[in-house]
C-alpha cells in the first residue's frame, strides 16, 4: 500500500541539518517533495554536510555508516490520494491502492539484505527503522528488511523506538506552549512529588 513520505523526508531534512553526508536512494517515480529536497540541499551547504540522490540501493549503501531503508509511496500518489479523500471517492482510493501495490511489486529487490549490508562501511553500518518494519519471512513474504538483519539490530531499534513518545510529547508541548522551558520549570517547582 501507499506508505507516507514522512520518514524519508524527515531524515533528509534533519540529518543534513546536523552536517551529515546523506544519500537518498529510490526507484524512478518515488520522488519526495521537491521543497524538502531543497531544504536538505540548503542544510547540507550551511553545515558542511552533503546531500545527493541516487537510483540504486547499492549506491546508497556503499561505504555507509548508517542505513535507514524505508518504503514509501511516490509524492504524486500522495497528492492523488488527498484529492480522492477530499472528494469522498472510496472507489478511486481503492483503485489507487491496487495501482500502488502493483507498482511496489516491481521493486521487491529493494530490501535490506545481508548482501546489501556487506556493502556498508566495514560491513557494519547501523541499521535504523521507524518501526514497524516489513520483515521478510516474519511479518510478510517479501519485506523491507531480511529477518537476520533485523534481528541483529533489535537493541538499537528498540532504543530508537523508545524515544518516540517523548519526542511526540515534546512536539505537542512546543506547539501548544509559547515558552516550554518556563512551563516545565514551573511544573517542576510547583510539584511536591518529583517525577524524574
Task: Map each language-model feature to its residues.
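Hydrophobic/aromatic ligand-binding patch that stacks against planar heteroaromatic rings
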Residues: 14, 116, 148-149
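Glycine-rich loops and low-complexity Gly/Arg-rich segments
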Residues: 47-51, 78, 91-94, 151-155, ...
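Glycine-rich phosphate/diphosphate-binding loop of Rossmann-like nucleotide-binding domains
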Residues: 1-83, 87
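Residues that form generic nucleotide/phosphate-binding pockets
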Residues: 39, 43, 119, 174
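ADP-ribose/adenylate-binding Rossmann-like module
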Residues: 77-141
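Adenosine-phosphate binding glycine-rich loop
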Residues: 120-196
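Hydrophobic alpha-helical scaffolding
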Residues: 1, 103-110, 157-161
Amino acid at each position: 500500500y501507499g506508505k507516507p513520505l514522512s520518514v524519508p523526508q524527515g531524515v533528509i531534512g534533519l540529518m543534513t541539518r546536523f552536517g551529515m553526508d546523506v544519500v537518498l536512494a529510490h526507484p524512478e517515480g518515488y520522488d519526495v517533495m521537491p521543497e524538502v529536497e531543497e531544504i536538505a540541499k540548503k542544510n547540507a551547504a550551511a553545515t558542511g554536510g552533503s546531500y545527493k540522490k541516487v537510483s540504486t540501493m547499492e549506491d546508497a549503501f556503499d561505504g555507509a555508516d548508517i542505513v535507514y531503508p524505508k518504503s514509501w509511496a511516490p509524492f504524486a500518489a500522495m497528492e492523488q490520494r488527498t484529492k480522492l479523500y477530499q472528494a469522498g471517492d472510496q472507489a478511486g482510493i481503492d483503485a489507487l491502492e491496487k495501482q500502488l501495490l502493483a507498482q511496489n511489486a516491481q521493486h521487491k529487490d529493494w530490501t535490506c539484505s545481508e548482501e546489501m549490508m556487506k556493502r556498508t562501511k566495514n560491513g557494519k553500518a547501523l541499521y535504523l527503522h521507524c518501526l514497524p518494519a516489513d520483515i521478510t519471512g516474519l511479518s510478510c513474504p517479501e519485506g523491507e528488511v531480511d529477518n537476520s538483519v533485523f534481528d541483529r539490530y533489535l537493541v538499537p531499534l528498540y532504543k530508537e523506538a523508545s524515544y518516540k513518545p517523548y519526542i511526540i510529547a515534546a512536539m505537542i508541548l512546543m506547539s501548544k506552549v509559547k515558552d516550554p522551558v518556563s512551563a516545565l520549570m514551573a511544573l517542576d517547582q510547583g510539584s511536591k512529588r518529583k517525577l524524574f
